[in-house]
């Protein structure tokens, strides 16, 4: 089925099964001068899911992979400034690619006592991770972004203090 239909069906299922204890949001490289559209949509999707009772907590996942900023820390700071309470957002800081995002965050969620877990990302990444999730994190449900539901027109993401996300002496993995 198409990515659009896959996202819509997953969202309909999530409506019936909400609330989740936590959602996992994979990181995207943070660029201080220009936030990417992928980062914007993932953060706005997390906010939508939090504001609409789909989840009580959010784990952002990602290390300093392609920029000198730890993706998950930057995303957490941004989401906190958008109104998701800081005590309900977490940063998983080791993951360097998609499968590590889901696996390390799933392990973190379990350590924190969360049992009802979902992955919240774009439909393409969600679909790519589906077989990995089934094999290694079978209790994780997908809630891919439904673009007709997401309202990214709400404005630009806030400017944040990136001091705590910056890695001195950073070396790209490429």
Features from the language model and the residues they span:
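Basic, amphipathic N-terminal segments that precede the first structured/catalytic domain
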Residues: 1-2, 174
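A structural signal for short, hydrophobic/glycine-enriched beta-strand patches
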Residues: 2-165
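Accessory cap/linker subdomain of secreted extracellular hydrolases
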Residues: 167-174
């Amino acid at each position: 089925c198409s990515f659009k239909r896959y996202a819509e069906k997953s969202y309909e299922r999530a409506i019936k099964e909400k609330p989740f204890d936590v959602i996992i949001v994979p990181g995207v490289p943070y660029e201080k001068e220009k936030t990417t559209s992928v980062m914007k949509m993932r953060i706005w999707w997390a906010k939508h899911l939090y504001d609409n009772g789909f989840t009580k907590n959010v784990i952002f996942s990602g290390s300093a992979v392609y920029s000198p900023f730890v993706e998950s820390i930057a995303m957490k700071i941004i989401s906190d400034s958008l109104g998701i309470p800081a005590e309900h957002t977490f940063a998983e800081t080791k993951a360097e690619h998609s499968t590590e995002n889901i696996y390390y965050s799933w392990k973190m969620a379990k350590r924190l006592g969360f049992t009802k877990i979902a992955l919240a990302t774009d439909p393409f990444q969600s679909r790519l991770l589906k077989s990995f999730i089934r094999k290694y994190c079978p209790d994780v449900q997908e809630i891919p972004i439904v673009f007709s539901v997401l309202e990214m027109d709400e404005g630009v993401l806030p400017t944040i203090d990136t001091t705590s996300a910056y890695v001195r002496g950073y070396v790209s993995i490429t």
